[in-house]
Structure formats: C-alpha cells, structure tokens
C-alpha cells in the first residue's frame, strides 16, 4: 500500500512563505540544509498540519535561480477550522482571496482561493460549518 508523504514547492523568500503557511495552521517540524561540494545549495523547511503524517516541504535554493509555476499545477486544498480567522491572519500579510468566500452548492462548505507568496494557488475550505 502506498502512503502520501509530502508535497514540495520551491520558494523565493523563506520568511514570507513560512509566515504564510504558519498563518494557515501549519506547524514547523524541522529544516535541513543541502550541501554539495562544500556549498550550501538549498534549505528545506518541513511543515506538518493536524494529525496528518504527510508534510509540506518548502525548498529555498540559495543560488538565486528563478522558477516557472508551469501549466500543469492546479492547487493545493486545505480544510481549515476557521476560514474567517485564517483569512484575517493572511490579510495582515497583505494577502487577499481571489474573490470573497463562496459555496459551490447550497449547504456546502465555504471556500475561497488565495495565492501564496510565490504564486501557488491554495484552496481554503472552511470545515467549521459556518
């Protein structure tokens, strides 16, 4: 049987990215420097969320290279205990939802989409039943 372990995204500003994901309830677990030929190449920041054993790996490359999100990436979806509080925390960082939270169907959960500091689209789903 397979097990989902982690999702890795490349980041350009560790401070901004870490603050973004921490505002959504991710908990910092550890970091790991990648050194090749005596040179610091990358730093990986690992974050867990809730009871899940899978983690989010934020990778910062120290060589300054740039990245393209590509056309195949869609989004990461997160279920949150309190969407309103999470959006307020993100607003303090200057991050606004693409549009106001909405329901896909009557009686369904409230949801919205935001972009993290590197432009990755994140779906936020309120599981509080509000």
Segments predicted by a language model, with ranges:
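Short, charged/polar surface micro-motifs in flexible loops or helix N-caps
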Residues: 50-54, 63-65, 83-85
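Eukaryotic phosphotyrosine signaling hubs
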Residues: 4-6, 72-76
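Helix N-cap motif at beta-to-alpha junctions
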Residues: 13-15, 80-84
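Exposed loop/turn and edge beta-strand positions of beta-sandwich/beta-sheet ligand-binding modules
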Residues: 41-43, 72, 108
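Short amphipathic alpha-helices within nucleic acid-binding modules
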Residues: 20, 83-89
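Core segments of cupin and vicinal oxygen chelate
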Residues: 2, 8-53
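Vicinal oxygen chelate
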Residues: 31-34, 45-46, 78, 87-130
